[in-house]
Amino acid sequence: MSSLTNPTTVMEEEEVPVAAPIRRGNKNPRRYSLVHQASCETQHHIGIRRQNTIQHRKQLTDQMREQKILQQLNDEGVEVIFAANDVSSIDFSVIVTSTDYISTFVSDILYNMKSAGVQICHVETRESKAVSGHDVLLDCRATKNQLIKAAELLTQNHVALTHFSIFSKKSVEKSQSMIWFPRHISELDQCSKCITKYEPTTDPRHPGHGDDEYIARRKFLNDQALEFKFGDEIGYVEYTEDEHATWKAVYEKLGGLHESHTCSVYRQNLKILQKEKVLTADRIPQIRDVNKFLQKKTGFELRPCSGLLSARDFLASLAFRVFQTTTYLRHHKSPHHSPEPDLIHELLGHVPMFSDPLLAQMSQDIGLMSLGASDEHIEKLATVYWFIVEFGLCKEDGKLKAIGAGLLSAYGELIHACSDAPEHKDFDPAVTAIQKYEDDDYQPLYFVADSIHDALAKLRKYASSMDRPFSVVYDPFTKSIETIQSSADLEKAFSRLSNDLSAITHAADRMKISITA
C-alpha cells in the first residue's frame, strides 16, 4: 500500500518526455496521499470529540445547579468533570479570571475551594491579558462532586468572575495511553481496514470505469486480500496476459531511467532481484517469492491488502517490518501512472528499497514512532514518510537521484523531480513534518537527503523530540512490541542488549588474537 489514490483525470505519463509545468488551483488532486488521509482522520476525530463534548455539556446541565459556570467553562473542563467520579480524587489545574481586587479574589477562591473540600496544592497570580483584572492559576485535587461544588460556589459568591477553565494535568499522557496499537504482528489483522477513495465502479475518471472485466478482476483480487489473516500462506495469483503486458510495459519504460535518475542503492538491489529472477520483465512476480527474498535481506515482508489504509494502521504495520501491499494492477489504458496504490508501484518502487538495511530501518523507525502517537503526530509522521520514503531524493556525484518509491515507479514524475523545474530543499524531519503537501500536478517541492544514512540519523534525532509518555522497542524474536515506562522495562531491554554486545565483544577479541598471532 503506497498511499497513492487520486480522483482526477489520469495523465498518460509516457507521453511526457520532459518535466511538466506545475498547475495550481485544481480542486481534484492527482492522488489522495497518505498525508491527505492522515489530515482527514485528524479532522474526523476532532469532529467526534467536539460532538462528544457538546453531548457531555448537555448532560452536565442536569448535575449542576449553577448554569453560569457551564457557559464559562472550557471544553477540556467539561471533559475533566464528566470523566471524574465521586470515589477517587483527580489532579487538575484551574485558571480563573476576575476584575475584582486581587486580594479579594484570592480570598474568595481559597474560602470557596476549602468549603467544597478541594485540596489546593499550588497558587500563582498574574495580570490578565484578556481583561482589566487578574488571573489565578491553581493546581488542585478533588472528587467530581467537590469540583462541581467549588465551581458553583465560586460562581455564585464572586460576581466579578469573568473566566473559568479547568485542565487535566495529565491529559496528554492519559489520551496517548488510551490509544490502541498492535503489540504483536498477529494484531495487524486489526489494521487492515481499507479506506476507499477511487474506484472504477463509482468514479468515471478512473481509467477502468466501464470496463466490467477489469472491475470484476479487481474485486476478485481485493476479496482475496481481505480474507488474508496472520499465519495464512499467501496464495498464488494467476495473472492474465494483459496484466503481464502492463507490467512489462512499465518495467521496460522505467529501465531507461535507472542509470540516470535512480540512486545507487536502488540500482544495486534491482540488479540482485533481477539476477535471482525475483523481478523479471516478462512475468509479474508472486508476493510470496518476493517475501522470501526480502526476509533474507532485511526481514521485511509484504502483506496483501485491498487498497489505501488509514495512516495510523499503515504506519503501525511498518513497525513490524510489514508493508501492506495491493495485489491488483493499474488499468492497461494508463500503464505509466498509478493514481492509487497498485502492485507495480509496490514491486518496482518499494521492494528494491526495502532490500536496503538502512531504508528498511528508517521505515521501521517511522512505524515505531507512530505507535500510540497523537493524531497530530500521526499527521506529521505521515508527511515525513510521504516526502522521503515515497518522494524523496538524494545527492550522488552532484546529481539528484530518486530514493522514493512513488518516483521510482512513475516515469513522468521521476523525470520532473530530478529536473530544475521544482524546488528542492534539504531534508529536515522537523521542517518536512509541517510542510503542506501539494499535488495539483507534479509536486512543486521535493526534499533531498545527503544519503539514506543521513536521513536515518536526522529521523532518529527528530524522534527524540516527540512527546510520548513511553518508548517502544521491537523484539524481532517474538515479533512483538515492548513498551518502556518503568525501570523494570528498561532493565529487561538492557539485558537483551547486553547479550548482543557480549557476542560482539567476543568476536572482536577473537579478531585481535588473529591479528597479533
UniProtKB/Swiss-Prot annotation:
An annotated Gene Ontology molecular function: tyrosine 3-monooxygenase activity
Locations listed in the record: Cytoplasm, Perinuclear region; Cell projection, Axon
Regulation affecting activity: Phosphorylation leads to an increase in the catalytic activity.
Stored InterPro entries: ArAA_hydroxylase (IPR001273), ArAA_hydroxylase_Fe/CU_BS (IPR018301), ArAA_hydroxylase_sf (IPR036951), Aro-AA_hydroxylase_C_sf (IPR036329), Aromatic-AA_hydroxylase_C (IPR019774), Tyrosine_3-monooxygenase-like (IPR019773)
UniProt KW S-adenosyl-L-methionine keyword: no
EC number: 1.14.16.2
Location (main, coarse): cytoplasm
Modified residues (Phosphoserine): S33
Disulfide-linked positions: none
GO cellular component terms given for this protein: axon; cytoplasm; perikaryon; perinuclear region of cytoplasm
Name the UniProt record assigns to this protein: Tyrosine 3-monooxygenase
Gene: cat-2
